[in-house]
């Protein structure tokens, strides 16, 4: 029996996506909704005991109309999220089954996650109590004042861009959320709350392919990534991201028309 519960945070507002007709997580990506793509690696993972999908209350009618049968078939627990991300996770935590010892939180707008990435971050969470995918900062970072004039260049050594999944011992995460009010309003991810309790979260090397959709251009990039992953399936041997270089090295062999609509 699996030890992990997965919370899919799907209650965002998609204000920057630029489609007045639908939110980004309901957009079609290679024949399936983005949120379903984000769930794929968890659906086939043997350590996952429960999946909770937290949607915006105003999306309930749309979700039930489009996805009720799929959610029932996949045995998903679909709940209403809150006004902010932390509110959504707090509500989902209340629904985690007693048997689950670890909780993974994943953005519904990250549809290119692979099962190898999931296995790596699950393993690190078992060993260390808390783990997240992240990528090293490669660009030069500038700090500015409110006037947008630069004040300093921030050293990028040991700086990382946090991704999801972020995975925690259940008791650590529940304790962190019990003290959420003390963290203030500026909570941007779940590791921030766990760190406030004095716990350290280990970083597992992530991938730039595990992008978070923000704009419709990101949707085109995600389409390309999924097609590449389909052409170059990942194996379980070696470290989980060993094949990325080969994938991108072979990219010129694909026609642009294979990846993007004209």
Indicate where each model-derived feature is located.
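Short, high-confidence coil segments that cap the C-terminus of an alpha-helix
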Residues: 48, 100, 126-130, 199, ...
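Conserved donor nucleotide-binding strand/loop of the catalytic core
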Residues: 71-83
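SAM-dependent methyltransferases
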Residues: 1-5, 190-191, 208-210, 219-262
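Residue-level signal for inorganic ion chemistry
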Residues: 8, 35, 92, 106-107, ...
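N-terminal glycine-rich phosphate-binding loop and ensuing alpha1 helix
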Residues: 1-61
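Structural beta-sheet core signal
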Residues: 6-8, 53, 105, 130-133
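Conserved core of the sugar-phosphate nucleotidyltransferase
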Residues: 112-204, 243-262
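Active-site nucleotide-sugar/metal-binding loop of Leloir-type enzymes
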Residues: 87-102
